[in-house]
Amino acid sequence: MSKPGGHPRHGRRDGIDPVLRSRARRRALQAVYAWQISGGFAKQVIAQFAHEQAHEVADLAYFENLVEGVLTNRAELDTALTPYLDRGVEEVDAIERAVLRLAAYELLYRQDVPYRVVINEAIETAKRFGSEHGHTYVNGVLDRAAVEWRKVESGA
């Protein structure tokens, strides 16, 4: 739906609804977490959550891109995150690990998403689902990583 003047109902010219993107990120977190815990096959995890997501209004294409991206590039994401962690990737709490992998994927592979949006969404997701101080850890890791990964955008 559009507002008068031809802009999408959410007021963004690029057609992206930030609310739907946030929901897609939350569902992607749940899918990545389930995959980490179960060790299931990527396609099965995506199919299960995509089916469930069809009933929830969210950006399904973005959800699928995030989950596939993390599952396909897990080794590269973990390698990229390692210099910014104070412990091994597998030692990070499972929720925070999933949040960090999703955010790393967006920072490294989704240059169309501003780094501040990625970090803020990761912090809010960690607050909602993670441990008591997990969001602080996520913030510190991603702030340091973004300076390197998005040098031009962050002004470093």
Swiss-Prot record:
One of its GO terms (cellular component) is cytosol. InterPro entries: NusB-like_sf, NusB_fam, NusB_RsmB_TIM44. Involved in transcription antitermination. Required for transcription of ribosomal RNA (rRNA) genes. Binds specifically to the boxA antiterminator sequence of the ribosomal RNA (rrn) operons. Disulfide bonds: none annotated. It comes from Xanthomonas oryzae pv. oryzae (strain KACC10331 / KXO85). Transmembrane segments: none annotated. This is Transcription antitermination protein NusB. Keywords: RNA-binding, Transcription, Transcription antitermination, Transcription regulation. It comes from the Bacteria.
